[in-house]
Amino acid sequence: MTKKVTVLGSTGSIGTQSLDVIRAQEYSVFGLAAHSNVELLLRQVQEFHPHCIAVVDDAAADRAARELHGMPGAPVLLRGKEGLEELAAMDGSDIVLNAVVGIAGLAATLSAIKSGRDVALANKESLVTGGH
């Protein structure tokens, strides 16, 4: 059975490397998230056809909405930090890979865990600040 993966931070170095592995292993991409690199995110959308994407930065989310408008099979667009957390918790994904830089990734990690998703961490802050 093909695992469905959500990659948070898909436009960063770790995120793009993760997508290289996903591509080679024939995993399915359920969701992608970026802070503001809409150009790369949209290229990833064209290749991986995710069900949903999240863009944290407001201006970048507006640009993504314009670019996605009228696109056949366009993914659902979530916005802001809340959108990132919603994507992390969304049903349909088997694994959430968190490659978000810094403390910004903690809330998304917690959302994924609370919703029962398997979490792959490339975000040490989630361990350092979220642990006891």
Residue spans of the language-model regions?
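N-terminal glycine-/serine-/threonine-rich beta1-alpha1-beta2 phosphate-ribose binding loop
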Residues: M1-I103
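Short beta->alpha connector loops at strand-helix junctions that form conserved
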Residues: V56-D57, A122-K124
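Rossmann-fold NAD(P)-binding glycine/threonine-rich loop
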Residues: A64, I103-S115, K124-H132
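A short hydrophobic/small-residue beta-strand
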Residues: D118-V119
